[in-house]
């Protein structure tokens, strides 16, 4: 297939040549590698690449992927990094409106009577910046003579990929991994990878989150070798009997390549407690009963077990060994109250954007570790990944720390239904448009398939502030069908109550007052109540928190919420007059339209210094640990 620039304009094309989403488990060549958490099957492509910036698609170097192309005009750029923070593009923060409002008239594809009005909307726009990346690499010895895929863990917003002059594929969905098979065109040395990233595409209508509007390759890029027998996908489904405190594990495994033996081991924190042997068929579905009482997982006791699957050949040599931590816990609704392991669940939560004051949404494992430690010392027991999937490593950290997760799908179309504060959903997407269904469901599928093994995830969230419609009904049904062990969350049906019966297991609101919450709970409530956003911490805020905390003792069906939000979105810049480093917020970069200091709602400053408001959080959340 040949690439088409008009893929940018239509929601019908969102993945081309992309491999199916799968579990995020890691795998190793030896037991020693697994012990060190260093896999020889992985090769990082992070580092210095070559780069060219174009203001639109028409002016981009169209043949830059060809091996004979002269890239002398390209400049060095660090990957991962936002293109804006490399100095090529204006910084821009906005909350609700689409970033082009006031500059261009645009409506989502298929939302008007003109079913062709979207053609050229982004592909022919006079302003839709393009980043053209080139990177030359040699394969490490361990990756040679094997199947090799490339994983982009985060690219905003639409990308085309070539290797050695051959088109590989196309991907949207900025915040989940995109993988492509490079094997047919790969060489041992002097490979030329070309990636073309477009700032906006039809996906911009459903990635309208409250944040700085960056683009580029902003998360890790790596190569992954697949040995001759490979575990493609792994789903550990622990089942926990709360009364008996016993457990069993369902395993759904998908292998590729040669059929070989597999040694299965389950470890607790001290020793191996279960072993079994199986064969690496294409599909494996097995059930294993734990031999003794199990230790449940919760915020207070984040007990983890570890599954190991070692593939061995006929000579007994290890081909591959995979590892997946998991835990036993049960989340359910009984008598309209959410229970975790048989006890009422109280959410002392916070919404969290990924952020660093110098690198934006390009963050590190150290940043994540600081955030989790900060939550723990301030009695924050839950996090909502607002409003997109986070880096893979953050989910592991929450598993280990006992932080409850609301795992949000990358979906927000705020500007399509709320205009200048008024609810006006006449061209809301995805809404009930068939043409938007596949792209939207693909985002749910990728979110689920990638993170399904993480015990910390109690809720799948359909997204944020996208109103409602039949497409979200189908998202809800997808999550419920795939994973009945978790709850599904969505707030937007509050504004479209005709969908309340078919979307969301919980009554979720934003910024409802204590009086409004009481009114719901005093009038035949049908679902447990949570606040997916509350206590908007902008400026010197967070007063009145006790009014919400008191409700926890008054109503069993009121089960807490997620403060907005954890960290300011602000950037450290050098003032040209004083030479001092200072934090700048939305609107400080001559970015228009903008919502200005609305980017600064965190309990901690962008520099990760706690604000005084955090004292309130520590005190009140500490009452209901």
Curated annotation (Swiss-Prot):
Stated EC number for the protein is: 3.2.1.23
Q: Does the keyword Iron-sulfur apply?
A: no
| UniProt-recorded name of the protein | Beta-galactosidase large subunit
Report the GO terms under cellular component. beta-galactosidase complex
State the UniProt keywords alphabetically: Glycosidase, Hydrolase
Q: Which reaction does it catalyse?
A: Hydrolysis of terminal non-reducing beta-D-galactose residues in beta-D-galactosides
Q: Name one Pfam family in it.
A: Glyco_hydro_2_C
Q: How does it assemble?
A: Heterodimer of a large (LacL) and a small subunit (LacM).
């Amino acid at each position: 297939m040949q690439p088409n620039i008009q893929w940018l304009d239509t929601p019908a094309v969102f993945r081309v040549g992309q491999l199916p989403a799968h579990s995020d488990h890691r795998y190793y060549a030896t037991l020693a590698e697994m012990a060190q958490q260093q896999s020889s099957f992985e090769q990082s492509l992070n580092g210095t690449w070559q780069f060219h910036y174009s203001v639109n698609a028409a002016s981009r170097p169209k043949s830059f992927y060809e091996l004979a192309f002269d890239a002398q005009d390209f400049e060095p750029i660090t990957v991962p990094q936002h293109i804006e923070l490399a100095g090529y593009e204006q910084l821009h923060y906005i909350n609700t409106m689409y970033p082009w409002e006031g500059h261009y008239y645009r409506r989502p594809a298929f939302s008007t009577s003109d079913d062709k009005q979207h053609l050229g909307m982004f592909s022919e726009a006079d302003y839709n910046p393009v980043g053209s990346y080139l990177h030359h690499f040699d394969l490490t010895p361990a990756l040679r003579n094997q199947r090799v895929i490339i994983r982009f863990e985060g690219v905003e917003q639409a990308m085309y990929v070539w290797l050695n002059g051959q088109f590989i594929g196309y991907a949207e969905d900025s915040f989940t991994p995109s993988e492509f098979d490079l094997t047919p065109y790969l060489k041992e040395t002097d490979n030329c990878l070309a990636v073309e990233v477009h700032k906006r595409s039809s996906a911009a209508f459903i990635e309208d989150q409250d944040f700085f509007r960056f683009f580029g390759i902003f998360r890790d890029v790596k190569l992954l070798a697949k040995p001759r027998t490979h575990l493609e996908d792994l789903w550990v489904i622990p089942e926990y009997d709360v009364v008996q405190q016993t457990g069993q594990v369902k395993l759904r495994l998908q292998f590729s390549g040669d059929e070989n033996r597999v040694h299965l081991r389950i470890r607790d924190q001290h020793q191996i407690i279960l072993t079994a042997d199986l064969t690496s068929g294409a599909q494996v579905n097995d059930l294993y009963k734990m031999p003794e009482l199990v230790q449940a997982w919760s915020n207070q006791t984040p007990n983890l077990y570890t599954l190991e699957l070692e593939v061995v050949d006929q000579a007994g040599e290890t081909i591959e060994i995979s590892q997946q931590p998991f835990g036993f816990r049960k989340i359910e609704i009984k008598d309209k109250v959410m229970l975790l392991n048989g006890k009422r669940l109280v959410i002392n939560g916070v919404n969290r954007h990924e952020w660093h004051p110098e690198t934006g949404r390009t963050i590190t494992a150290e940043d994540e570790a600081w955030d989790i430690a900060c939550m723990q010392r301030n009695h924050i027991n839950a996090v909502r990944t607002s409003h997109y999937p986070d880096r893979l490593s953050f989910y592991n950290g929450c598993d280990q720390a006992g932080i409850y997760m609301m795992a949000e799908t990358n979906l927000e179309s705020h500007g399509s239904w709320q205009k200048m504060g008024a609810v006006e959903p006449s061209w809301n997407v995805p809404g009930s448009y068939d043409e938007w269904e596949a792209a939207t469901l693909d985002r749910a599928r990728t979110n689920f398939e990638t993170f399904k093994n993480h015990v910390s995830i109690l809720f799948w969230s359909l997204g944020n502030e996208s109103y409602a419609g039949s497409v979200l009904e189908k998202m809800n049904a997808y999550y419920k069908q795939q994973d009945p062990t978790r709850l599904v969350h969505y707030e937007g049906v509050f504004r479209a109550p005709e969908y309340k019966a078919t979307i969301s297991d919980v009554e979720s609101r934003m910024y409802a007052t204590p009086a409004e919450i009481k009114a719901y709970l005093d009038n035949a409530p049908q679902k447990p109540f949570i606040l997916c956003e509350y206590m908007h911490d902008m400026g010197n805020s967070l007063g009145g928190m006790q009014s919400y905390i008191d409700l926890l003792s008054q109503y069993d069906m009121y089960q807490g919420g997620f403060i907005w939000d954890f960290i300011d979105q602000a950037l450290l810049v050098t003032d040209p007059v004083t030479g001092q480093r200072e934090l700048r917020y939305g609107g400080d970069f001559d970015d228009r339209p903008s919502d200005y200091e609305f980017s600064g709602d965190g309990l901690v400053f962008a520099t990760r210094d706690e604000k005084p408001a955090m004292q309130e959080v520590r005190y009140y959340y500490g009452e209901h640990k």
